[in-house]
Amino acid sequence: LVRGRVSGLFTEIIRACKQADLPIAGADVLKISDELAVRDITALLRFLALPEDDLSLACALRSPLFGWTEQQLYTLAHHRPDKTYLWQALRGQTGLQGATLAILDDLRGQADFLRPYDLIARILTRHGGRKALIARLGDEAADGIDALLAQALAYETSDVPSLTGFLEWLDSDEVQVKRQMDAASDRI
């Protein structure tokens, strides 16, 4: 029994159990904005909603979704003309960033037409986002990813689905997911 969930001990116990392949249910309360995988996905969503958002694009490029190094990002940002957005500079590049540009072009082309859930699912499946996030952040990233998908579905049932609306809805309150622990389940 852990007295509080705020300390790092609780998170470390869950991580150690997952690494030891013990059947673990995870935390009973998950604050999705604290999950790194969720932050990476929402950074990409923020860029898709507003391509002029240099910070969100930089965060997405450095995330496991694209795997850019600090040097690659610095080179792109430093060598761009004055008053040029990072997205414009990336589009003007030739060569090395072809795969990144293809993914971003695909997602930008769909951002105005797909519902938030479908857009997130496209990032995670078609473009290998789930695999990349879990490979870099560990199995515990799956909990945050699944919670974000569930929240996207919940949002779509309560509001007219739009990407900017979903991002505002996520920001409006600290979204916490409370899990129902199944008594019949043989999980820690």
Predicted regions and their residues:
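Basic, alpha-helical interaction scaffolds
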Residues: 95-99, 104-107
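Conserved motor-region signature of P-loop NTPase helicases/translocases
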Residues: 1-75, 86-88, 102, 109-113, ...
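Amphipathic, charged-and-aliphatic alpha-helical interface segments
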Residues: 76-82
